[in-house]
Amino acid sequence: MTPALAQLAAAHGVATTYQDWADSPVRVSPAAVVAALAALDVDAASTEAVQAALVELELAPWRTPLPPVLVVRGGPGRLDLHVEQGAALVLEVVLEDGGRIPVDGVPVALDRRDGQVHLQVALPDLPLGWHTVEATVAGTTTSCPLLVAPERLAVPEQRTWGWQVQLYALRSEQSWGVGDYADLRTVVTSARADGAGAVLVNPLHAETPVLPLNPSPYSPSSRLWRSPVGLRVEDTLEYAGAPAELQQQVSGLRPPTDPDRVLRDPSFAAKLAALELLWPRHRVGALAQFRHLHGGGLEDFALFCALAEVHGTPWQDWPEQLRRPDGPGIAAARVAHAERAAFWCWVQLLVDEQLAGLGEDMAVGLVHDLAVGVDAGGADAWALQDVLALGTTVGAPPDSFNQQGQDWGLPPWRPDRLRAAGYAPYRALVRGVLRHAGGVRIDHVMGLFRLWWVPEGAGAAEGTYVSYDAQALLAVLALEALRAGAVIVGEDLGTVEARVRTTLDDAGVLGSAVLWFETDDDGSPLPPRSWRPAALASITTHDLPTAAGFLAEEHVRVRHELDQLGHSLQTEQERVRTERERLLAMLGAEGLLSEGGDPVLAMHAALVASPCRIVLASYADAVGDLRQPNLPGTVEQYPNWRLPVADASGTPLTLEQVLACPGVRRITALLQQVR
C-alpha cells in the first residue's frame, strides 16, 4: 500500500491495519481500502485519483465559513471558521427556543491561505440543546447545527434487578401465536409487583409488511418504528367500541397456535385482516394528531409499507421513479396510496398506545434493544439511503469462532453523511427508540466507534474497519437520554478495544457483564465481586447457551449435529467440561454453591453478589429451557427466533405457566436480595 493511499485512508477513517482477536496486527489489503473509500465517494482507484483526493481534503474546509456541525460536551466549546481575511464577521447562537446569544469572543487566527484565514473563537456558556450557529461574513449569513450535550449520562443510583425477555416466545393464552404487547404489559406488571426495577425486551423494530416476515428482530425493516406483529387487536379502542358482531368477527380470525414454533406469518396475516375490519372505525382526530406529531418520517414509512404491498421487496426492484422518497413518482404515489398510507400510520398509533406507560413507575423501566442496523431492502434503507453506504454491509473480521469472518448483511451509516446532516438521522433514531422507554441497550456498541465494512461481492474477511465520531454520537445519546430520563447500556462483549470501554464508562454508558465471559486472562471465571459495577449483569444472551443448556451441553450437541463445531466433538466436549468445572468450582469457592445445590440458582446468586448496577435474569433460565433463542452461523438449519419458551423436557409453556413456575418464584426471591 502506498503512503499516499494510507494517508488518504486515515483522513477518512478507513483502517489500513487492525489488531485481530489474538491481538496480532493484520494488514488490510489495498483493494479493501479502495473499496471502503469508494463507498464514501472517494476515488482511490489510481495514483492520480489518490493525489486529487488528497488535494480535495486540503481545500474542502476553506470553501464554507462554518463546519457541517459543531458538537460541544461538558463545557464551553470552540468554533472554527474559514473566512475572507479582513471581512466583517458577526457570530450568534440561535437557541432551540428561539433566543439569541452573541458570540463576542476574540477570534484567534490559526492559518492563512489565498486571502482567507482560519479562525477559532471561544463560545459562551450555553444551555444543553440542539441550537444553531449563525455566521454573517461581509453581509452574507450561513449557519450550522450546534449540539450542546452533557459530558456524562446519569446511571442508576441504586442497584436494581429485573428480567430480560424474548417477547415473541412468551405467548399467553390470549395472544395470537406470538407474544404480544399485552403479554409484555403482563410481564412488566408482574415484575413490578415483585419489586423489580427493569425489564429488557428484544428489539421491537418494524418489519416490512410483506410475507414471509424475517423472524430476526436484529434485521429489521425500520428501527424508527415498531412492529405491528406485537399488537393485541382486542386491546385497541376501535375493537372496544365495535358492535358485538364485529368483535366476534375479529376474534374469529385468531389463527391456531403451533405448540412448538412461533409462527409470525399466520399471526400477522390474521392481525392485518382484523385491523382492516376495524379501520373504518379509526379515531380520525387521534390519527391526525399522531401524524402531525411524527411528521415526514412517519409519512415516509407508511408510504413505504403501502408501496411494498404493491411492489414487493426489496425496494431496489421497484419502478425506478419510486426508488427514492423524493423520486419523480413519489408525489403521485402519495395521492394514489393515501388511504393505505393512512392505514399504516394508524397501525403505528395503535402500537404506540399499547407500549405507552409500560414500566414508567419502575426504577429503570422498560429497556428497549437497538439493533446494529437495518435490512438493505427495507424502509429505513429506502428513506435514509443518502446517509447509508448501500452496497456495503456490516460484519466482523475473522476470529477463533468464525475463521471466515461474519457478514451481517446490514448497510452501515456513512460517517461523512451523518456529519453533513448534523447527526439529525441519528437523533431521530435515538428519539424513536427512547419513546416509551426507561432505557436502551445498544447492540454491538462498538459500532459507535468503528464498524467492519464488507465490500459488495467480497468475502467477510476481505473488509476493513471504518471509524465514526464516537464523541459526537455519544453526545447525541447523552442529550436525548437525559431528556427521556433513560439509562443507556452498551453490549460490549467479545473483542473490544480498551479505549472503547474507558470512553463508554466516562460517558456513563453501562457495559454488559455476562457470566460466561467474566474471566481472567487464562480463562478462569472471575468471582462476581470482581465484576465492574458500571454494567448490566446476566448469565447469558440470546446468542449463547441457556444456563440449563450449558450444564447439559445442549449447545455442543446441536452444533455437532449441524456441523457447526469446526473441530472434533471430543475436543469441544473437553473444552466445555473444563469451563463448567471451573465455573462450578468458582461458585463453590465463593460460597454460592453447596454440595448437591442447584447450580442454576448459584449462577443467579453470582449476579446478586456482583456490584453491577442492573441484574437481569431470563425466564428461559428460570424454567430450565435447554435451547438458546439464536444459534449464530445458522439460518434455516436451526429455528432461530422461533422457539417458544419451554421447560426442561421441551414442553412449551404459556406465559401464565411461566409466571407460576416454581423456578421463577425461587429466582425472584433470590433477586429480591439485590441491594
Protein language model annotation of sequence segments:
Residues 80-160, 170, 176-186, 194, ...:
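Extended acidic/polar, glycine-enriched regions
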